[in-house]
Amino acid sequence: MPEEGSGKEVPFVCLTSKEYREEEDQDSMSSKPKSVGIIGAPFSKGQPRGGVEEGPTALREAGLIKKLQEQECDVKDYGNLSFVDVPNDTPFQIVKNPRTVGKANEQLTRVVEEVKKNGRTSLVLGGDHSLSIGSISGHAKVHPDLCVIWVDAHSDINTPLTTTSGNLHGQPVSFLLKELREEIPDIPGFSWVTPCLSAKDIVYIGLRDVDPGEHRILKDLGIKYFSMTEVDKLGIAKVMEETLSYLIGRKKRPIHLSYDVDGLDPSVTPATGTPVPGGLTYREGLYITEEICKTGLLSGLDIMEVNPSLGKTPDEVQRTVNTAVALTLSCFGVAREGNHSDNRL
């Protein structure tokens, strides 16, 4: 495929995770201690089920910060953002809570931008997945060349005009894509949003509940995705190889991983708002984060839709929270094969 503006064929080079690491320069994340900025985003108005705002506290109480520090991460906790419900937040057509969701994301954008300007990997603890509008927008203000890996049972790419539920946690990607700019009406609360991604900048993994309108958008825009059918057919190793080759095979750039825990099978993460059977296994979920970590290019991470109130038993809550913590730790270097410090006796 010709490189844009070059007028000639450019050979496609597929780098392995090891080669990505070897090519990192002295300023890369892989050549110095991992610096993490944690932002708690206790927000639920992008969907109808209460309890997802408890996610950040549950993850911290599970020892996330201490475990990151034990992994030799330099951690700064920015605390929980304080979100305010906008009064008289009437629906826009059927879109619910537009002003409240828009304001929350604008607030998150500013904080993520600050974290990135401070040179830290942003770690947003959700909260519902509508917050990725702010998380990715803030990241893109500092790293406009970023790419996104979106792990989810859902594509979250409904527009305000195609949505059948009106829930904004099913629409964030449509606000972020430049190709859909003309499909987004002027919604109260979102005048600040500037699309920051092109269709070629995102890859989905784990899809298995996609609305017809969303499927049309994915196909029309040529967006790369691996539904669970492709995961089953190819295996997660091939999926990750193709994902990384597609996004960073030609040029290294920052990776933003937006991870909805409902991407995993409900047997693994039952305490979430929109579980869908037939999802990623625990092992597949960790393989994704391990491979992204190995690139040394992870620059932003969202852990979304942990809802402790939806676990039917304490075990279901603990299983979901512990899995979310494990995914996060894996992003920052905890490997199933084991780890050791570079410090020698």
Where are these regions (language model features)?
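Residue-identity detector for glycine
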Residues: 5-7
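Aromatic-lined glycan-binding groove of carbohydrate-active enzymes
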Residues: 199-201, 208-214, 250-255
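Active-site histidine-anchored catalytic micro-motif
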Residues: 117-194, 295
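Active-site-proximal loop/helix segment associated with metal-binding centers of metalloenzymes
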Residues: 187-192, 208-226
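Short, well-ordered beta-to-alpha junction loops that form the rim of enzyme active sites
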Residues: 42, 126-129, 153, 207, ...
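Short active-site oxyanion
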Residues: 120-122, 199-203
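Short, structured patches in soluble enzyme cores that scaffold and shape functional sites
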Residues: 150-153, 177, 201-209, 227-229, ...
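Catalytic cores of soluble, metal-dependent hydrolases
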Residues: 12, 17-20, 24-44, 48-123, ...
